[in-house]
């Protein structure tokens, strides 16, 4: 869902379909966030070829949610309400599933009996721990399945470490990307001069005034060439010493 990548795909002839009515014929590619199972079933019923590109880590959340439902748990999804990944998870989590974004949301829920938690893959471990602490005293049984993506956790930890060593941080990635926004917030907590950009053209010289060490990292949906391409030379031309965060492998 990176805006630049979506634009490049459109230029290559791949159109973005908001729903199946926009894809009357041909092949439908399910994006990494996944969808509710009814969408895939409906696509096949219409004779469309379905290429399921759902992230394997997201599929693990679907499987975990379905297992909790079978075992009699009410499922709570820790994540961003309305986010495409979360909407897809809800399709596997039973009719009484709900979404909480933080501990305060959990406090407002009416809970009883057996509750099972799954997590949007790009959430922080800290947020999960806070939600668990809020729910635990209020239920008979709580089962937590930590479905945070390992690569996401590693990237968040590395970004925090990098931000602590830098005078300025640049986060590259879509403004609509949940995991990129979380990276930006994590970096901002450690480095006041943190800037979230989608393209190198957004860089401003004033950001790097008196900055001796400049850190750069990116969200999971940002292609490596968008970091290695125009961004690094522009930052170096501002006179800063660049520290780049290596990308952890997913899996």
Language-model segments: residues:
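The feature marks the mature, well-folded catalytic cores of soluble enzymes
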Residues: 1-220, 224-251
């Amino acid at each position: 869902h990176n805006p630049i990548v979506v634009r490049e795909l459109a230029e290559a002839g791949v159109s973005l379909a908001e729903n199946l009515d926009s894809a009357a014929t041909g092949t439908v590619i399910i994006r990494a966030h996944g969808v509710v199972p009814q969408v895939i079933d409906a696509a096949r019923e219409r004779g469309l070829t379905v290429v399921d590109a759902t992230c394997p880590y997201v599929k693990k959340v679907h499987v975990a949610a379905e297992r909790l439902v079978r075992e009699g748990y009410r499922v709570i999804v820790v994540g961003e309400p309305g986010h495409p990944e979360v909407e897809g998870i809800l399709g596997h989590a039973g009719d009484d599933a709900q979404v909480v974004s933080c501990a305060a949301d959990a406090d407002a829920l009416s809970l009883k009996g057996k509750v099972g938690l799954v997590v949007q893959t790009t959430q922080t471990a800290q947020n999960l721990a806070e939600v668990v602490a809020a729910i635990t005293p209020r239920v008979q049984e709580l089962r937590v399945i930590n479905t945070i993506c390992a690569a996401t956790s590693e990237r968040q930890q590395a970004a925090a470490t990098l931000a602590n060593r830098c005078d300025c941080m640049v986060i590259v990635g879509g403004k609509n990307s949940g995991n990129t926004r979380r990276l930006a917030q994590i970096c901002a907590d450690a480095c006041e001069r943190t800037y979230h950009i989608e393209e190198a053209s957004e860089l401003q010289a004033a950001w790097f005034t008196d900055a001796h060490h400049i850190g750069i990292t990116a969200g999971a949906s940002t292609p490596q060439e968008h970091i290695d391409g125009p961004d690094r030379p522009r930052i170096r031309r501002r006179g800063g010493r660049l520290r780049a965060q290596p990308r952890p492998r997913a899996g």
